[in-house]
C-alpha cells in the first residue's frame, strides 16, 4: 500500500477535518469511512482507484486525526463537513463514496449539496433508521462506552486508532457520541426520491440491512420499476448490487468492489 501524496486539515463547519489524497486527474473520488473508522480503512481501495484519478479519504469529526468539538454527532453536520472539505480543497464536482455510517453522512451531503456530487456510491447504508434489522437497532439503542469500550480496546481497530488520534482518551466519548447519533430517528425517503445524480447502492447478501430494504431504497431512485427493454434503453441511471458471501463488516475487502465502483464512476 502506498503512502498518500498529500494530507492535511480542512476547516469545515467548525471542524478541522483530516484528509489524505492520492493520484491526480479525472473526477475526484471522495471516500468516507464507517463508524470508528479511519482513512486507512480505504488504503488498498484508494491505491486501486488512484491510478488514473485523484482520490481523497477523510476522517469525520471525532474519528482518527480529526478532533471532536464536543457537540452531538448529527447526520446533517457530517454532511456539512464533507461539503466543507470538497469546497476547501477546490475539488469542484466529485464522486462521493461512503461506507456504513459514512454512507449516511455521504447521503446527507448529496441531499444538502447536490451540486457538489456528480455520482454517489453508498455501501451498506440505508435511507431510514427502520431499515436496519431489529437486532441492529437494539444494539444502537444500547451503544455506549460502558457497554462497548472493554470489548473494543483489545481490537485491531482500536490499536490503529490509538496510533493517529490526537487525544488517546477520546475513544470512549466517540463511542457515546456515535451511539447517540445512531439512536436518532431518520427517514430520508422523500429527499432520496428527489435526488438527480445517479446513485450506486452496494450491499452484502448477509448485511445488517435486509435485501427488501435495499430494494425499497433502489425503488425510490427509480430502480426496479419495469423491464429495462431488450437493448437496456429503459435501464435506470442508478444501480443496485448485492455481493454474495459478504457481511456488513467485511464489505470493503470484497474482491468485486473496486471494479464495480470504477465501472459506475468511470
Where in the sequence are the language-model features?
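Short beta-strand/loop motif that positions the catalytic acidic residue
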Residues: 195, 201-203
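Conserved alpha/beta-hydrolase "acid-adjacent" motif
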Residues: 208-216, 225
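Active-site nucleophile elbow and catalytic-triad environment of alpha/beta-hydrolase enzymes
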Residues: 175-191
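Flexible "cap/lid" loop of the alpha/beta hydrolase fold
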Residues: 104-112, 116-158
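Active-site loop/oxyanion-hole signature of alpha/beta-hydrolase fold enzymes
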Residues: 56-97
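Catalytic histidine-centered segment of alpha/beta-hydrolase-like enzymes
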Residues: 241-255
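Acidic catalytic loop of the alpha/beta-hydrolase fold
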Residues: 206-210, 248-249
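Conserved HGGG/HGGXW glycine-rich cap/lid loop of the alpha/beta-hydrolase fold
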Residues: 15-67
